[in-house]
Amino acid sequence: MDSKIQKLVILFVFEKMAIPLTEATVLDVCSSENDWLSYMECKQYLSELVDTNLVYRVPKSECLNITQDGISCLALFFTRIPSSIRDEITAYARDNRMRFKKRQSYFCDYSKNADGTYTVIMKINNESTTLMELKMVVANRSLAKFMYKSWVDKASQTYALLHDTLLD
């Protein structure tokens, strides 16, 4: 595939995923999880798409998204992408969109404190703001890791519980 088609592939991924994506997510989707582009080419073409205003950086976020010009460009030239790749991208987006949305919306990290305890930071973000940030100090690393691993699956449930409890 030539560089123009590879750039169209990236635009097609944005359109089909229908959510803003981090650069790391685009690189994973296009080159690690699928073999649509090489990592280095994907990184270069993504940067070029931003430079030419076909993709933009979402304000107050690490995410990127397709611009209206990018949508127009894709509408004119998407047929240049081989239909087999378009079908793969469409199926991949349908099957994985929510997984990536959760991964980007629900942030969690932990760090060791001077006294040997751990602070776990859990966040729920939307496209441009943090909806909730929760910090908890736990006794040891295993508890911090457990919370870290549980956060993506339990974030919305935790938010709803806190919201309902505080507003009762």
Summary of predicted features, one role per range:
Residues 36-51:
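Short amphipathic alpha-helical interaction segments
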Residues 8-12, 28, 32, 47:
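Contiguous, well-ordered alpha-helical segments that form the cores/surfaces of helical PPI scaffolds
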Residues 50-60:
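A short, conserved structural fragment
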Residues 88-165:
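Exposed, interaction-prone assembly regions rather than primary DNA-binding/catalytic cores
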Residues 59-77:
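Accessory beta->alpha helical hairpin/"wing" motif in late/C-terminal subdomains of nucleic-acid enzymes
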Residues 71-90:
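Glycine-rich, Lys/Arg-enriched anion-binding loops that position phosphate/diphosphate groups
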Residues 1-20:
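Short alpha-helical segments that sit at the start of domains
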Residues 20-30:
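Short acidic, hydrophobic short linear motifs in intrinsically disordered regions
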